[in-house]
Amino acid sequence: MRKEIEKLLQSVQKPARYAGGELNSVMKDKSKVTLRYAFCFPDTYEIGMSHLGMKILYGVANAREDTWCERVFAPADDMEALMRANGEPLFALESGDPIKDFDMIGFTMQYELSYTNILNMLDLAGVPLRAEDRKSLTPIVAFGGPCACNPEPVAEFADIIFLGEGEETTNTVLDLLKACKESGKSKQEFLEAAMHIQGIYVPSFYEDSYNPDGTLCALTPTHGAPATVKKSIVSDMNKCYYPDSFVVPFIDIVHDRAVEEIFRGCIRGCRFCQAGFIYRPIREKSVETINRQSKALIDSTGYDELSLCSLSTSDHSCVNEMLTSLIDWTVRDKINLSLPSLRVDNFSDELVDKLSKVRRSGLTFAPEAGTQRMRDVINKNVTEEEVLRTCTKAFAGGWTSVKLYFMMGLPTETMEDIAGIAQLAGKVVDAYYNTPEHKKGCAVSVSVSCASFIPKPFTPFQWEPEDTMTSLRAKQAHLLESVPSRKIRVSYHETPTSLLEGVLARGDRRLSKVLLRAFELGCKFDSWDDHFNFDALMQAFEECGLDPDFYTKRRRPFEELLPWDHLDYGVSRKFLELENKRAHQNVTTPHCRIRCAGCGANKLNGGHCDARPEVARDTTAVQ
C-alpha cells in the first residue's frame, strides 16, 4: 500500500475497507502481467464483498497469467472527502494503484439505485464519465450484471456492456483487449471487434430516436452492429469456473459466509420476478460438484457457515440427496448449513427432518400476496392451505420464527388484497399455537416484509404502470391497521426510492443526462435512506425536460417499442404478452417441469429445458 493511502486511513472509520491484504486476496507482479482489470462494486466494501458474482469473476480474471484483477468499492463519505481534499484518485485494494491507469474498469449493476455511485467513482478516479470523451484504447469501461438487461439509462457512460453471464465472455473480451493493446489497435477497432462477441453490447453503435409523444421510435444500429444482441449463457454449471476460495475480510460484511451456487434459472414463472426470466433455462450442478466445491470453500476460508444459493433452493431436482450429502460432513464439522429461498409448496416432511439436523435459524417463505386471486394474477401457484401446512410442519419441527415476504402495488391489487396479507400472517400465528408439537414456553415470531412492486424488463408485467407513492402509502397504512396480533412485525420499503428505481428500470437513453445532472447536484448512495436526495433528483428531471411519471404511471401498449427490445435474453416477447393477458384473467401457468410454456429459452442451448419443438399448451384461450 502506498504511504499516501496509509496516511488517509488513520483518519477514517473502518480503515480495513480500503487496506486490502485479506486472506485469499490475489497479489501479482504487475511487471509480469499484460492487462490490469479493476472490478468495481458501486457500493461500500461490506455490501460489495458479500456479492457472489464479484467473487466468481475476480477468480475468472485472476486465473489468467496475463491479467491481474483487483477489487474497488465506493468509499464512504469520510474517505471520499479526504481523497478529494488530498488529490488522491480512486485506487484498487490489492495494489493501491489508481484505477485510471488500468486497462479495463468494470462495474457490476446489481440495482438501479447504484447508478449515481458509478458516476461518482469514475469521477473520483479521474476518468471521463461519458464514453465519447474517452478517446484512447484504455481504460475500457464495462458494465454488467442483472440491470444490464436494460442498460439504456447508463448507455452514454459505458464502452461495452456485458449481457447475461460473464464467466466465459470475460475471457473472450480480455483476449481481444490484449490483442488490441499489443498490436496498437484503436478503441474504435476494439469496439468494432467486440460487438461480434455474444453477450457484448456496444451502446455507442446504436442511435436512439423518439416519437412526438416521447415514446421510443427506433434504436438504429450503426457501424455494422447487429440488430439484436443475444445474452451470454453458461451451458454446463459442472464445468463452469467456480472459485475454490473467497477473499476473507478483516471486518464484518453483510453476508460473511461461504456460498455455494447450486443452480441457475428458475422453473416457476412468477410474473413479477425478473430473475426468474432472465436467468432461464435452469442449469443445475450435480450433487458431487456441490459437495466438492462446498468442502473446498470451507477448507480455504475457515468459515463455519455454508449458504446454498439459487432462486429456489428446494427446486433442485436432487435436493434430498444433496442435503443428505452435505449434512453428513457439515454436522460433523459443526458447520451451519443455510437454505434460503425455500418454496412453500415443496417443503416436505423429509426436508423438515433434514433441516432439523442443522443449526436452527428462522425460516423464510414468500407467499408474495395475501389473497388467492392476487397469487393467481402473479402466477405464484401457492395456496393459503399450503402456506399454513408448511408453517405447521416447521412449528412441529421446533421452529418458532417465520419470515414471510410479500409485495404491494401489484397489478389489479385492491385494499382487500392488502388486508389479506395481515390476515394470512395472523393465521400463521394461530397455526403455531394450534400445533400440538410446538415448542412449549416460546412465543412465535412472524415477520412480514412487504416490498413495493416495481415492473421490470423481460417480465410479463413490463407494460404495467407502477403504483403511485400516494397509493402505496395508503396501502402501507391499511396493512398496519389490519395486523391482528402483536406477534406480527411488519416492515416495508420507502416509496420515493421505489419511484426512482421504477424510472431507471424501464427508462430510455435520455435518462443518461438526468443521471449526470443528478450526480452534479450531489446525488450518490441513492439506496441509502440517509443519502437519498429526492429534491435533487426531481430538479435533475426538471432541468433535463423529462417527467418521471412518463416512465412509471402509464401502461405501455403491446405495440410500443421498449428500450430493451433489441436485446435477446431468451424469453420471447410473444410469450410475455401472453402471460400478461393470462394475469389479467387470473389464469395461472404451470411450472416448467409440469408442462412447457413455450417461453423460448430452449433456443439458448444451455442447461436443462423441458421445452419441446411445439408449444405445449393451448394459447388461444387468452387471445
Identify the meaning behind each predicted range:
Residues M1-S31, Y37-F39, P484-Q623:
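Radical SAM enzyme core and accessory elements
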Residues C40, A296-K403, M408-S447, P455:
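Conserved SAM/AdoMet-binding glycine-rich loop
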Residues Y37-D43, A61, V247-Q274, I298, ...:
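N-terminal pre-triad scaffold of radical SAM enzymes
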